[in-house]
Amino acid sequence: MDPFSQLSQLQHNLQAMTKTVAGLENDMLEVLKENTELKVENQLLREKISKLDANKEPAENKSQAGLKSLRNIYDSGYHICNMYYGSHRESGEDCMFCLDILDNFVNHGQKSRG
């Protein structure tokens, strides 16, 4: 096989591999998206179960539990804001919308105590 044919064959193989990698990347993104949605849904269902089990808790404990749940979701790397709820945050990246929600939640709880 001459060098040109070898180069042509190599280029064809590279294009096929590029398509395969792109397909795998798309599949991985879909799996990650579904995983995120399931984690958020799971967390929401756990919160609903907690609410059903603990209807007699004082309001302050409920709000603290809600804040803790939101904080856990956010700390796990997911958005809790209306704009991006449930989507994955980049590592080390903070979202001002999510942080605003957490800040308002904390400040609202402090005002109701005072």
UniProtKB/Swiss-Prot annotation:
Function as written in the Swiss-Prot or TrEMBL entry: Involved in control of chromosome replication initiation. Inhibits the cooperative binding of DnaA to the oriC region, thus negatively regulating initiation of chromosome replication. Inhibits the ability of DnaA-ATP to form a helix on DNA; does not disassemble preformed DnaA-DNA helices. Decreases the residence time of DnaA on the chromosome at its binding sites (oriC, replication forks and promoter-binding sites). Tethers DnaA to the replication machinery via the DNA polymerase beta sliding clamp subunit (dnaN).
Similarity comment: family membership: Belongs to the YabA family.
HAMAP family cross-referenced by the UniProt entry: YabA (MF_01159)
Source species of the chain: Lactobacillus johnsonii (strain CNCM I-12250 / La1 / NCC 533)
Pfam families, per the entry: YabA
Subcellular location: Cytoplasm, Nucleoid
Lineage summary: Bacteria, Bacillati, Bacillota, Bacilli, Lactobacillales
InterPro entries on file: YabA
Name this protein carries in UniProt: Replication initiation control protein YabA
Keyword terms of this UniProt record: Cytoplasm, DNA replication, DNA replication inhibitor, Metal-binding, Zinc
